Amino acid sequence: MKFTELTVTEFDNFVQNPSLESHYFQVKENIVTRENDGFEVVLLGIKDDNNKVIAASLFSKIPTMGSYVYYSNRGPVMDFSDLGLVDYYLKELDKYLQQHQCLYVKLDPYWLYHLYDKDIVPFEGREKNDALVNLFKSHGYEHHGFTTEYDTSSQVRWMGVLNLEGKTPETLKKTFDSQRKRNINKAINYGVKVRFLESDEFNLFLDLYRETEERAGFVSKTDDYFYNFIDTYGDKVLVPLAYIDLDEYVLKLQQELNDKENRRDQMMAKENKSDKQMKKIAELDKQIDHDQHELLNASELSKTDGPILNLASGVYFANAYEVNYFSGGSSEKYNQFMGPYMMHWFMINYCFDNGYDRYNFYGLSGDFTENSEDYGVYRFKRGFNVQIEELIGDFYKPIHKVKYWLFTTLDKLRKKLKK
């Protein structure tokens, strides 16, 4: 085996293997996004004795104190169950960094530490991956810890994932809780549609994202941050928009209303109606009243807000391994149409149609108590019967130790001065 720099083609060919647990940051398209952010990129990996790539990682080189911080965001990509391979990678990476002006290195691999069901019950027969964590420590890495909160300096360590392998949309939907099934069916009955936005329509996503940001008060990303991905990731970034055409909905409602009124009139025309028939008529009367009310509201909404209402939108990344929900927004004013549910259901079906076995709802804090900052987010994802995946976390290692000590000391002083 040999540790070496890789070409873009070598890197790309390797990470296209769907059996490898790889992240959308470890794709060739991310080279340009990192360069757009002002960082150099280097591709490092391992080749076996037949010159075949068996490990790969995309590193950003972040200029710091006359040296570089080497950061492989969600790397490296390899068979991490092969501890011998991981050991060799870490040993040879250290040698490389010693020769290439590295201040310190940060790795946050997309590697599983433990696996749980939706209720945070560990999967039977699964063990915590302490061997991997201990291997990193044996190479001088500091583990950032088994965190259970969001940290703006780190990628998420907990995720909610739908495993689609061996399932169909129908069998999967049966595993959802009653609220998820009911709301998806509501959206379908409303006639909510989903389409992918073109790059020049991305402002429609941003409008919904900014509305949600203001409503929820979360830390948002800039427009430029999103456009960096939109402009470079090509077909690896997907932006669905859930919307409703009120003209079509009104027409559908009118047809249903006409049908119910005709059935009611036919039943009323019969003589000597039984109690059972009278109950059916009473039920139809309720449905007719409801439909008339809905028809009036939809007609008024179309007049004031226009016939097309944008309900929800999201940014997704698709790589060889999975489809990953990155960020989203929705309109609170139109929440009765269940736009977010239809968007997720559409994208889940997209996975089935395109051969993906994983639909990743992505980030959770890891605190699953009712008082946690994202308990509502957890409940939403839990309702889809996700499996909870815990990743091994962040690892740091100083390479230039004297300069690293100076760097951390100055950083502590800066933080004290800010208080």
From Swiss-Prot:
Keywords: Acyltransferase, Antibiotic resistance, Cell shape, Cell wall biogenesis/degradation, Cytoplasm, Peptidoglycan synthesis, Transferase
Cellular component terms (Gene Ontology): cytoplasm
Top-level lineage group: Bacteria
Enzyme Commission code: 2.3.2.18
Main location, first listed in the record: cytoplasm
GO BP of this protein: cell wall organization; peptidoglycan biosynthetic process; regulation of cell shape; response to antibiotic
Class of this enzyme: transferase
One Gene Ontology molecular-function label: aminoacyltransferase activity
SUPFAM superfamilies documented for this protein: Acyl-CoA N-acyltransferases (Nat) (SSF55729)
Pfam families: FemAB
Catalytic activity field: MurNAc-L-Ala-D-isoglutaminyl-L-Lys-(N(6)-tri-Gly)-D-Ala-D-Ala-diphospho-di-trans,octa-cis-undecaprenyl-GlcNAc + 2 glycyl-tRNA(Gly) = MurNAc-L-Ala-D-isoglutaminyl-L-Lys-(N(6)-penta-Gly)-D-Ala-D-Ala-diphospho-di-trans,octa-cis-undecaprenyl-GlcNAc + 2 tRNA(Gly) + 2 H(+)
Location of this chain's protein in the cell: Cytoplasm
Assembly description: Homodimer. Interacts with FemA.
Recorded family membership: Belongs to the FemABX family.
Protein name as catalogued: Aminoacyltransferase FemB
Organism: Staphylococcus aureus (strain MW2)
